[in-house]
Regions:
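Conserved donor NDP-sugar-binding/catalytic core segment of glycosyltransferases
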Residues: 47-86
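Active-site donor/metal-binding and catalytic loop motifs
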Residues: 69, 158-190
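A recurrent flexible, glycine/aromatic-enriched loop bordering the glycosyltransferase active site
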Residues: 98-121
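Glycine-rich, basic loop-to-helix element that forms the pyrophosphate-binding segment
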Residues: 12-30
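A short, conserved alpha-helix in the catalytic core of glycosyltransferases
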Residues: 112, 116-117, 123-128, 134-162, ...
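Short beta-strand-to-loop acidic/aromatic patch adjacent to the donor-nucleotide binding site
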Residues: 32-43, 286-294
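Acidic donor-binding segment of Leloir-type glycosyltransferases
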Residues: 1-14, 256
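Acidic donor-binding/catalytic loop of UDP-sugar-dependent glycosyltransferases
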Residues: 42-55, 296-305
């Protein structure tokens, strides 16, 4: 490429860095005041960047509206229209898409964020960009969106600027999208083993950092419950329960043999930057201690654990003790 404005980074390996790392390296070498996170399977529609510039301000993150083929469930934050799932299909339908763009413009904005998104470079670097905890990929986007939200950034999605997003590229669907003989697109159960493994790893690290699953409203604005300092004190624990419960708290106590704990740490530590030895069976004075019997843990009880941050927030907890379901909760301090 001979364009003097084009800059690129090449990872010669052997370690896969992924976009969690490489996005930030690209931002670092960018010499423009505004930067954007953009997927390689997106087609920038005419007028899109002009719409970004219309709305960009300090501490504002501007997203374009995605036009997508019906590969994923519909939602109010995007437009489902099929102009092809592969470049070879798209080039035959490109003119049809371009003819549709004027009628798709809505002259409005909504509050949400999804790629492609744009902001001032200073606003990206001031919160240290993406967290390498989630490298090479998965959950790094929700993590940075949460931090934008907590730092008071405003989310703007313009409905006058569009990309056509083919979706389903990269490691999740290594072979791209597929059509059956009837021309219908199918994606279910086609994720690669690599993606499934990394997604599980990143999800567990996201839970350790935030204490809840990824949350957002219907227009993709982040929902960020408070993060409490929580300790689980589990009677009748076992190695499987340790694996299930450890990411959901900051500290966990179980009466387990050292070899069970060591085996878990040996297996799990390679997948996280969190020091697991400082989280398991250590003497600390946690803000919130939750006691329960592992033998009584049901599917419903586990669901309550997954919503613990929201439950504690809605309960307007104070120092003291209370119970719900199988859980006895001691609140020593209330901090988030």
């Amino acid at each position: 490429v001979k364009d003097p404005n084009f800059k690129a980074i090449r990872n010669d390996g052997p370690t896969r860095l992924g976009h969690t790392i490489l996005y930030d390296e690209l931002v670092e070498i960018a010499d423009t005041p505004i930067v954007g996170i953009y997927h390689a399977d997106m087609y920038l529609c005419p007028g899109a960047l002009e719409s970004v510039l219309e709305h960009i301000k300090p501490k504002h993150v501007v997203s374009l509206t995605r036009i997508e083929p019906p590969l994923h469930p519909e939602g109010p934050e995007k437009i489902l229209m099929d102009f092809g799932i592969e470049p070879e299909e798209f080039v035959k339908l490109e003119d049809e898409l371009l003819n549709q763009i004027p009628s798709l413009k809505q002259g409005r904005t909504t509050e949400g964020i999804f790629a492609p998104w744009f902001l001032f470079k200073e606003d990206f670097t001031s919160i240290n960009g993406h967290d390498p905890l989630f490298a090479p990929q998965s959950k790094e986007d929700t993590d940075i969106f949460n931090r934008f939200h907590l730092n008071g950034y405003k989310f703007v999605q313009t409905w006058d600027g569009f990309v056509y997003h083919m979706t389903c590229r990269g490691s999740r669907f290594a072979d791209g999208a597929k059509r059956n003989p009837n021309g219908e697109v199918f994606m279910k159960n086609r994720e690669t083993d690599e993606w499934l493994t990394q997604n599980n790893r990143s999800t567990r690290n996201f839970l350790r950092k935030w204490g809840h699953y990824c949350k957002h409203d219907s227009l993709m604005k982040p929902i960020v419950p408070p993060k409490y300092d929580v300790e689980f004190n589990v009677e009748n624990g076992n190695g499987k329960l340790l694996e299930i419960l450890e990411p959901w708290c900051d500290k966990i106590k179980m009466d387990l043999d050292d070899d069970i704990i060591n085996k878990y740490i040996e297996k799990e530590q390679v997948d996280t930057d969190f020091d697991l030895r400082s989280r398991i069976n250590v003497n600390t004075n946690s803000d919130i201690e939750i006691h329960f019997d592992g033998n009584k843990l049901t599917e419903y009880s586990y669901k309550l654990i997954t919503e613990l941050s929201t439950i504690l927030e809605s309960s307007e907890i104070e120092v003291g003790e209370f119970e719900f379901d199988i859980f006895r909760v001691n609140v020593n301090r209330v901090k988030t």
